[in-house]
Amino acid sequence: GLNPHAGEGGLLGRDDATRIAPGIARARGRLRAAGVAATVDGPVPAESAFRLAVGGRWDGVVAMYHDQATIPMKVASFGDAVNVSLGLPIVRTSVDHGTAYDRAGRWTADEAGMRAALSLARLLRAPRPRP
């Protein structure tokens, strides 16, 4: 959600109910129409969403903005989590940490994050069978 506690039933803002929930419903409908089997829930309070995802409820979380996602991702699995940018004409994945320019040329960087980002990009790019 956008507002604290996803709006707390309107007490802390109506955006989650009036703007975000209808968008999630449209996305859910489009996925079903495309034959994609996915659990699409929300809006969910950010502090709960990531705890539930790490616990296995979902395979991923779509966050409202960058820092809302990167902070819990780094706490849960720094180094091997992958950031995916949606809404672009290309598949874009990136490591969950910064550029690490201070490590350039020193052979001290761990490539696991880059490998995870490349693997996910390959998976997202793969053709999917249509129903």
Describe these PLM feature segments.
Residues 1-27:
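Active-site rim beta-loop-alpha module in soluble metabolic enzymes
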Residues 23-131:
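Glycine-rich phosphate/nucleotide-binding loop
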